């Protein structure tokens, strides 16, 4: 910017420089060394604003305090700026005809690439920049439209070189022929080239089909918003309809649709797979029905497998001629594939009968469960005591529902039945039949039920004593008539006159001695006692039984103060029951036997307790003996250690 280098400036040039921003001040206020003497504009607002003034580039910005940037226009293109045509005279037209003066600061011609930093407002080189300081794309609409549509992206349009300067009349008059004649010629030539090169653009045609998305593009419409890669592709998009691409498939279309041979093979494969799946489902359904009926056999599947094998064999591809010469293993393998309904989906290592394996597993599970049930039942037999056999079981009068339940009917909760009504009907219908049931227990239970139903309040002391006396009489009668029971643990003789008292745990020697005495005296005492009691069993039991029944009925009537509830079989046992005397005697005998069994069980439990006490005592003695031995050993060890320490 030296005055010696530049020619003398006139008033117009001075005014233009005062409106042009100082490039050094735009970079930094301290960069410009001239300060207030600088002939260019120093605007802080323009320095902070990166946008360029559009009016400045058009040559008509009249605001001296414009907040937009006014970059220099003459040094960017290598020629001085000329004013507008309306502001200059005719002799001044010859000024642009002068030869362009290169920038003396740079000394080299500028390149045809616009400066990126200048467009962002950050170029600090100014006139020394080797790139063109061009405005942004919005600065000149007409050349910008021409560049995007028709000109290649890499070659700038000649009109762009003068876009930073003021446009003159000659440029404006010559621009329309240059802009609008080229599209007509290119479109005309493009249609001819389009017909010649239509079949050579298969890849681009498939791309257009995906880009259209179902919409047609008219032939006369030009895409101004996207620069096309080449002239031929742009014309193909604008001038050819969708139908031509469909009617003329390209070699690359096989990538999307596939060949005809592939489609045929795929359809045959799908049909064959569907046929196999359908037949396989029918075959599996048939096997499941047979398996659910618990009659699964391979012979039932013979006909179905044969039909399925023939149908699948007919649907398969023809086998080669060398199939007949194959060995036995290959034939078996093929036969297994034909028989397996899932041969089309499962590999050879899975060619097995799934239903057969399932049935075998089910059968093995059933056998294991049955064996486990047998073991558990044998273990629980000694722990769980089943209900005693009742009169209904002995007479075969078990209800039909319990008989239907089988052997587990006794383990299930018993059903509530009217024992009194059934007992009364049985006594009336079969008075002479040998009833060896539990008549006495049933009568006592009936009386207890009657007492529970007719309970009116607490009983007096006399009633309780009478009931206790009746119970003692019944026990004495049962002890006289009951036989001597023998168990596996201990044999005892029950006698009401000499009862066995439990004095406490006894040693093992005393228990064994008592057992030997019982075994030796059993043979002699059993026969004599049986003969003594056999004569008076029937008469005594009859009398005791009748007395007990009368006492029970009397106590019920006295305790309630009203007519007591009497079951149908609690009628007066007088002459009406004279035919059933034998039945009553046998019932009393059975009741005494049950009492004996209960006493035997209690005696066995006492014996178990005694044995446990004896075993515990022996173990304690043995433990004490071991403890003494351990103490002696410890003393010996201690003495030995002390001796070692002393020495």
Swiss-Prot record:
SUPFAM superfamilies: CCCH zinc finger. Residues 160-175, 189-203, 369-379, 435-445 have a biased composition (Polar residues). Keywords: DNA-binding, Metal-binding, Repeat, Zinc, Zinc-finger. It comes from the Eukaryota. A zinc finger (C3H1-type) spans 16-45, 47-73, 109-136. GO terms for molecular function: DNA binding; mRNA binding; zinc ion binding. PROSITE patterns: ZF_C3H1. Residues 86-106 have a biased composition (Low complexity). Residues 267-280, 347-359, 419-433, 527-536 have a biased composition (Basic and acidic residues). SMART domains: ZnF_C3H1. Transmembrane segments: none annotated. Pfam families: zf-CCCH_2 (PF14608), zf-CCCH_3 (PF15663). Residues 78-106, 155-280, 308-327, 335-452, 512-580, 586-605 are annotated as: Disordered. This is Zinc finger CCCH domain-containing protein 19. It comes from Oryza sativa subsp. japonica (Rice).
